[in-house]
Amino acid sequence: MAPSNLPPVFNATSQDMEMLLAAQCHLGSKNLQVHMDPYLWKTRPDGINVINIGKTWEKIVLAARIIAAIDNPADICVISARPYGQRAVLKFAAHTGAVAIAGRFTPGSFTNYITRSFKEPRLIIVTDPRTDAQAIKEASYVNIPVIALCDTDSPTEYVDVAIPTNNKGRHAIGLVWWLLAREVLRLRGTLATRETEWDVVVDLYFYRDPEAEEAKELEEAKAAGVDEIGPGAVESGFGAEGWEASAGTAFGAAAATTTTTNPATATATWEATGGDWASSAPAEGWAGEAPATEAKW
């Protein structure tokens, strides 16, 4: 790591550097844009370009100082069309007061005042210049400064401040947004001193797969159900005596109801039907033919 050009108060701690390395913020892609060459440390034998995380930290501090210089936090727009960065921008907006656009960027949001999503921010921050190209293009039309998380292969056209980092890994994206939010709060004075620990853990900025979370909740619910039943219930037969008693009572009540109600209902019904058949003309004809049939048999 090259020596830092920042004042001592802005220098990164060893813990910050360890977090950047653990999140693989230093691992770029195999391609290299010419404008990202100053941020390159070396190229590994397998072709992966390694980013100088000292430069990454310097750009995080520079971006935080730009953000803190804007009086109204609502004039800052944070954008991420990449799924891995959507949770991070929403959390960043919640903690700093910025406006978040997570998901698809509606074309014309910065240039077409007729649209409902029209905005006039003083600064935009994007997760990936390639996936958020529409937002950067419109910002260039209306002279909005752009801060972007740039990988080694990211286009830097119309990007004013490039933060060199891995912008494809969910941990790298979440960590950079978390560090940026923390530095902004420190510069605003929300965190009393630089030694004060931020009580928001970095895990909140990481992307979470909805399907994986759902499956995890189902497994936890199943495990909780097994624990509630327990081995004691299995050995005792799940309260078989109670089931027999309740079943016997239920069937006994049903039988009693049938015995008391059915005969009366049946008698009344058959009497009415018998009277109808007796009074009808065809019934007499059948009664006359019956003895002849008995004689034949």
UniProtKB/Swiss-Prot annotation:
It is found in: Cytoplasm. GO terms for cellular component: cytosolic small ribosomal subunit. It holds the Pfam family 40S_SA_C. Its main location: cytoplasm. It comes from the Eukaryota. Residues 276-297 are annotated as: Disordered. Coiled coil: none annotated. InterPro entries: Ribosomal_uS2, Ribosomal_uS2_C, Ribosomal_uS2_CS, Ribosomal_uS2_euk, Ribosomal_uS2_euk/arc, Ribosomal_uS2_flav_dom_sf. One of its GO terms (biological process) is translation. Keywords: Cytoplasm, Ribonucleoprotein, Ribosomal protein. The keyword Ribonucleoprotein applies. One of its GO terms (molecular function) is structural constituent of ribosome. Required for the assembly and/or stability of the 40S ribosomal subunit. Required for the processing of the 20S rRNA-precursor to mature 18S rRNA in a late step of the maturation of 40S ribosomal subunits. Component of the small ribosomal subunit. Mature ribosomes consist of a small (40S) and a large (60S) subunit. The 40S subunit contains about 33 different proteins and 1 molecule of RNA (18S). The 60S subunit contains about 49 different proteins and 3 molecules of RNA (25S, 5.8S and 5S). Interacts with RPS21. NCBIfam families: uS2_euk_arch (TIGR01012). Belongs to the universal ribosomal protein uS2 family. This is Small ribosomal subunit protein uS2. It comes from Uncinocarpus reesii (strain UAMH 1704).
